[in-house]
Amino acid sequence: MIQEGKLEQQFFDYLHSERNYSVNTSTAYENDLLDFRRFLNEQAITTYQQVTFLDVRIYLTELKQKSFSRTTVARKISSLRSFYTFLLRENVINENPFTYVSHAKNQLRLPKFFYSEEMEALFQVVYEDNETLTLRDRVLLEVLYGTGIRVSECAGILLPDLDTSYQAILIRGKGNKERYVPFGVYAEDAITDYLPERANLMSRYKKSHDALLVNHYGDPLTTRGIRYCLSKIISKASLTRKIHPHMLRHTFATDLLNNGADMRTVQELLGHASLSSTQIYTHVTKEHLKSTYMKHHPRA
């Protein structure tokens, strides 16, 4: 049973001190979280980390059945999304189950992904030279797109986690669950080219650790550091639309499904505890099929 505790109080303190929310707004957030906690207890969900996208959909259905106004539902979703964004920031969770629920219409919001032309532009950036940090960025991009792992998981890769004989990486994911994720020849070649340069860089700065990815001083690259590196790659590629690093994970899943991979396999590769978290990508592939049909069929 979930009871109000430290996490909620930290969130409410955050609303007051950092967001400068009024007392009335903060009270509304508290009531929304209280109602959601009641729902979770009824569903025998004992931690906020266990909540999946499917649980969110069930909760939305319940709100609809109770005839809440669209405005009220939108506010509740906004409150809970903010709470889960806070949990994400505090590294309590790895994914926000409210991400794909829109504010106004409570409709499914499809994950954004890179188109093939955009991926080509990104790879051109990391293959433009063989400088140490460019080689590092090449590994970063090849591994993230080639495995679909989260940015935080990528930051945690250690050299002993690499099994080159089986072309697989040991990943420590959500809830410290471990899984092996395969990687392809492009990622393998990128890692092979990078490791000697990594060793030289670490020797120059007298560093000693097992982190695969390092910064310009030879220290382990953090999650924030990876996001910064990816942002620089994206900027150099001159991509114009609003994008974020997590889209590489979305692109990995979407490309697999578009090319015939089964849902269960994609679920395992992504490290999703529930199949419902993976099913969001079937909507993306349907949109892809429709757009392809509309573009190429003479009677569309």
UniProtKB/Swiss-Prot annotation:
Record keywords: Transmembrane included?
Answer: no
Q: Which residues form the active site?
A: 150, 174, 246, 249, 272, 281
The entry's localization annotation reads: Cytoplasm
UniProt keyword terms in alphabetical order: Cell cycle, Cell division, Chromosome partition, Cytoplasm, DNA integration, DNA recombination, DNA-binding
Q: Which SUPFAM superfamilies match?
A: DNA breaking-rejoining enzymes
Q: Which Pfam families match?
A: Phage_int_SAM_1, Phage_integrase
GO molecular-function term, one example from the UniProt record: DNA binding
Per the database record, which ranges form the Core-binding (CB) domain?
Answer: 2-88
Report domain Tyr recombinase positions: 109-294
What PROSITE patterns does its record include? CB (PS51900), TYR_RECOMBINASE (PS51898)
Q: Which Gene3D superfamilies match?
A: 1.10.150.130, Intergrase catalytic core (1.10.443.10)
Chief location of this protein? cytoplasm
Output the Gene Ontology cellular-component terms. cytoplasm
Main function? Site-specific tyrosine recombinase, which acts by catalyzing the cutting and rejoining of the recombining DNA molecules. The XerC-XerD complex is essential to convert dimers of the bacterial chromosome into monomers to permit their segregation at cell division. It also contributes to the segregational stability of plasmids.
Subunit-level organization: Forms a cyclic heterotetrameric complex composed of two molecules of XerC and two molecules of XerD.
The family note in this entry says: Belongs to the 'phage' integrase family. XerC subfamily.
User: What protein name applies here?
Assistant: Tyrosine recombinase XerC
This protein's species is Listeria monocytogenes serotype 4b (strain CLIP80459)
